[in-house]
Amino acid sequence: MPRMDDSAFERGLAVRKEVLGAEHVERATARATDLDRDFQRWITETAWGGVWARTRLDRRTKHLVTIAILAALGRDELELHLRASRNTGTAPEDIAEALMHVAVYAGVPAANAAFAKLKAEFSPQPEKAPGTSA
């Protein structure tokens, strides 16, 4: 596979870690095999070193767009980006507003599924009683 210059990869790796979290990126990189190593590099160079590194839209806005698209398409990566939205200052209330647009333009079932994931990610977890185990 033709490679972009190393600066695109390095820039993409830095942006990917800032948005998704270093632990997630390191796990994804460690799980790469000969079958998908070039694909992982391409994602880092193109999506993260290219599109996410552009400056016209701020990261919060990019995250709203990404979340809305993933919700509309029913993609598994929605949960990852809901978690990562904390890293870009994307408020759950703003995500909920974007999901209203998903409901109108992509369908209520898509938005309903996304709202369930949004609530699961941002709903307060019940506190454990003292002396109980996890």
What are these regions (language model features)?
Residues M1-T61, R83, N87, N112-A134:
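Acidic, glycine/proline-rich low-complexity segments that act as flexible tails and inter-domain linkers
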Residues L20, W48, I67, L73, ...:
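Short glycine-rich loop/turn motifs that provide flexible caps or phosphate-binding loops at active sites
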Residues I43-A47, L64-I69, A98-A103:
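Short alpha-helical scaffolding segments that buttress acidic/His motifs in well-ordered protein cores
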Residues L64, L70-A96:
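Mid-chain, well-packed structural core segment of small domains
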Residues E77, H101, V108-P109:
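Substrate/cofactor-recognition hotspot
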Residues E93-E97, A113-A116:
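A glycine-rich phosphate/pyrophosphate-binding beta-strand-loop-alpha-helix module
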Residues V104-Y105, F122:
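Short Asp/Glu-rich motifs
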